Amino acid sequence: MRQRYLLAYDVADPKRLRRVFTAMKGFGDALQYSVFRCDLSEVEKLKLKGRLLEIIKEDEDRVMIVDLGPAGGRGE
C-alpha cells in the first residue's frame, strides 16, 4: 500500500541543496523549493531515505518526513 508523505528539508550547502532537490524530483512533486509531496511504497521510502543519506551531512542538514496517511485517501 502506498502512503502519502510530506517531506521538507533544510540543507546548509548550496551544492548539496541542489543534489537533494534533484534526487527528490524522482520521488514526488515539489510544493515549494524544499517541500515535496510523495506517494511511496515502503520500498520506495527506504530507497528515498538511502539516497538522501548519501547526500546530506547529518550534523549540518535537516530532513523531516511526515506520514499523511494512505495515498488517494479522503480529501483527494
What are the residue ranges of the model-derived segments?
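Basic nucleic-acid-binding interfaces
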Residues: 1-6, 12-76
